[in-house]
A protein has these predicted regions:
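Cross-family detector of peptidyl-prolyl cis-trans isomerase
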Residues: 1-331
Length: 331
């Protein structure tokens, strides 16, 4: 729900991937709504993917463990090298999916670590094929199983090109090495994951708890709309609690309290929504803050926390809005 139409899509701008830097750079504090401070990677050639060479992982070999990677030996391949270290058994990734990954990246020739998510205790989330990460990632991470650990050797043509990334100490001749754990993937068929919560208040809308990727049903009671914000679990996930400064990846559906008519939904578009809680109407920012990732939440937004006396497409002025929101990930 955004102030000028219905949903504000926030560019991901993942500094840790589109522009690597060490932990002291503050990249882990970057807002997804901010512009990257690094140059956009050059388009990569579409070439073959080879199986090596890649340097050995010397410790932290299990999925989820922070790895230590040896210095590269000899000359790296000019092609994109990808080795499956651990093959997962989860769903298969596809272009336009949102991926959630843990990773560590370093320079082939020096083993200098550029960036890692393991120390931040928070996976990175980005969309495949949307230019949010270096081209080597966009190509290597398609058609992989969630639960897999991959090791990549990414030559300059698939990373930052001949210009390199001087701010991070990456020369135009540097091959980059990454270990990547594929934690999860999300797309237009994703749903909340968690425990169903009883909906016993007869004065509130009822939301279905289906998790098949189809739009939930929302049944609005023929009663007076609440004057205050309502935020209740339909499905309670087990992820971290959302902070008011977070940006989220969600599925949602919105209907009018007055007649139950749908005015917007991600499900009909077949794509997820991403937004910062600082850039949406107050009913969303207040209603989702403190809720757990993985949850489905019923949010009833009174006019003073929504669009007030301003009409929007499909939304009359002074409308009470009813949403169900699946919180899939924090960006």
């Amino acid at each position: 729900v955004r102030r000028r139409s219905v949903l504000l899509a926030v560019p991901a701008g993942l500094l840790t991937l589109a522009g690597c830097g060490d932990d002291k750079s503050g990249s882990d504090k970057a807002s997804p709504s901010k512009e990257p401070t690094s140059p956009t990677p050059s388009p990569a050639p579409t070439g073959k993917i080879v199986s090596g060479p890649v340097p050995p992982i010397t410790s932290g070999e299990d999925f989820g463990d922070k790895p230590k990677i040896a210095k590269g030996a000899g000359k790296p391949s000019s092609d994109l090298a990808v080795k499956t270290v651990i093959k997962g058994n989860g769903p298969t990734t596809a272009k336009k999916d949102f991926l959630q990954v843990n990773y560590l990246g370093q320079i082939w020739s020096s083993a200098k670590v550029l960036d890692t998510s393991y120390d931040k205790k928070k996976p990175a989330t980005f969309q495949l094929g949307a230019g949010q990460v270096i081209p080597g990632w966009d190509q290597a991470l398609v058609e992989r199983k969630v639960g897999s650990r991959l090791e990549l050797a990414v030559p300059p043509a698939y990373a930052y090109g001949k210009q390199g990334q001087p701010q991070a100490g990456i020369k135009g001749t540097d091959t980059l090495v990454f270990v990547i754990d594929l934690v999860d993937r999300f797309n237009g068929k994703s749903s909340a994951k968690g425990d169903k919560v009883a909906q016993s208040n007869i004065d509130l809308p009822k939301v279905s708890a289906n998790t098949d990727g189809k739009a939930p049903t929302i049944t609005v009671p023929k009663k007076a709309a609440p004057k205050k914000l309502v935020s209740e679990y339909v499905i309670e996930g087990d992820g971290p609690k959302v902070k008011k400064t977070d940006a989220l990846l969600v599925q949602y559906k919105g209907v009018l309290w007055k007649n139950g008519k749908q005015f917007d939904a991600t499900y009909k578009r077949g794509e997820l929504a991403q937004f910062s809680l600082q850039q949406v109407v107050k009913g969303w920012s207040q209603g989702l803050t403190g809720k757990k990732v993985g949850s489905r939440v019923l949010v009833v937004v009174p006019p003073d926390l929504g669009y007030k006396d301003e009409a929007k497409p499909g939304i009359p002025a002074n409308s009470t809005l009813v949403f169900c929101v699946d919180i899939l990930a924090v960006l």
